[in-house]
């Protein structure tokens, strides 16, 4: 465990691996994960932020390098893989997005690959990076799966929500957007309060469900790996962890795909002219 506590029971082990490396922005000091003080608005999960930024930069570097060295001849394995991903995302956008914006395909590609990379961190041995963080860098806690942190998934969903508002106002105008919120589904002024409540809930539910769906699935997957490592004897862990890891590959890919698809669909709905 960390220098500030020792693992004595499976409960301690599980709790340790569910603690984020947190920074108190008021004092710029690391938060002791074993202190009883609750997290506040000024508490930053710097491990989630660090890994999400690093993986995002890795995505940009690799795809930029492949694009710069692309050849019309026989492509290498990396170029082939990148072209397959780009083709898959491009076809998905063509099928689901009916607007005119040219940034949706690059956005969808970024969302899919970035979320997939963050999800794939769940396939690393559960103790590997936390052990390195503790014994090499002296970190009191470390979580390595950014999408198992609700603040990360809701932040990404918030970005999608801002784009929904942007394209809605861009395509319909401020008046059209307000009319959409106040005159649907009942097209009569007397029902404006009811329409506003119904449409407001429908609009706000999109980013909330988008972020919580990804968080819930990845948190559950991470927790299962922790339970396997914390409750079972070492000689039986591989018997469950290996099959679950193989099945989890499908889950992490599917969750990245769902996040991308819902982003495209929501932006397509926002781009419709009425």
UniProtKB/Swiss-Prot annotation:
It is found in: Cell inner membrane. One of its GO terms (molecular function) is proton-transporting ATP synthase activity, rotational mechanism. Pfam families: ATP-synt_A (PF00119). It comes from Yersinia enterocolitica serotype O:8 / biotype 1B (strain NCTC 13174 / 8081). This is ATP synthase subunit a. The keyword Methyltransferase does not apply. HAMAP family: ATP_synth_a_bact (MF_01393). PANTHER family: ATP SYNTHASE SUBUNIT A, CHLOROPLASTIC. The keyword Glycosyltransferase does not apply. Its main location: membrane. Keywords: ATP synthesis, Cell inner membrane, Cell membrane, CF(0), Hydrogen ion transport, Ion transport, Membrane, Transmembrane, Transmembrane helix, Transport. The gene is atpB. Belongs to the ATPase A chain family. GO terms for biological process: proton motive force-driven plasma membrane ATP synthesis. Gene3D superfamilies: ATP synthase, F0 complex, subunit A.
